[in-house]
Amino acid sequence: MAQHDENVVWHAHPVTAAQREQLHGHRGVVLWFTGLSGSGKSTVAGALEEALHQLGVSTYLLDGDNVRHGLCSDLGFSDDDRKENIRRVGEVAKLMVDAGLVVLTAFISPHRAERQMVRDQLGEGRFIEVFVDTPLSVCEARDPKGLYKKARAGELRNFTGIDAVYEAPESPEIHLDGQQLVTNLMAQLLDLLRREDIIKS
């Protein structure tokens, strides 16, 4: 990775993050959904974004598959590539938070160190870790993309939960049971956002 060039300097914006938040009527923050493939991350994040949009909240959803079509299309699934994938997403999320958006991200992000890296990038009070905790057996039974079947057959290497480790969050801001109904999970998330004064009660 290229090193920082001392000739490249940060230019302050005439419009501040606080002014952007005032315009939107809410704080900028990231809800970082993490869990195994098939745990329900994207489904719950998508449902929450729709609910927040209906409440007049300015949102954007960054999905693990979608960013690999463009921003991270040059990356594979080695440990180094996974780390770079998450670093890039964290930087994009940080820009969106600075713009005053509520950003939802749905990434397996299997390593605690990478999730902590993004938390550190964003700063205090800007990162909400959402652990969608679904047993491997349930994820494998769902297998919406047929990836577990391929991994079990040896057609897919470095697949999280099969031959690559998933490090579960130790103290997420919210721990969701991925076997519950999406409506129940969404209600828990909306309650959290109200308690944190990110959206109005």
Curated annotation (Swiss-Prot):
Keyword Kinase: yes
Domain of life per record: Bacteria
Underlying gene: cysC
Coiled-coil residues: none
Any single Pfam family the record assigns to this protein: APS_kinase
EC numbers, comma separated: 2.7.1.25
Task of the protein: Catalyzes the synthesis of activated sulfate.
Organism this protein belongs to: Cronobacter sakazakii (strain ATCC BAA-894) (Enterobacter sakazakii)
Enzyme superclass (EC): transferase
Protein known as: Adenylyl-sulfate kinase
UniProt xrefs under InterPro entries: APS_kinase (IPR002891), P-loop_NTPase (IPR027417)
Entry's Gene Ontology molecular function annotations: adenylylsulfate kinase activity; ATP binding
PANTHER family: ADENYLYL-SULFATE KINASE 1, CHLOROPLASTIC, BIFUNCTIONAL 3'-PHOSPHOADENOSINE 5'-PHOSPHOSULFATE SYNTHASE
Residues forming the catalytic site: S109
Keyword Nucleotide-binding in annotation: yes
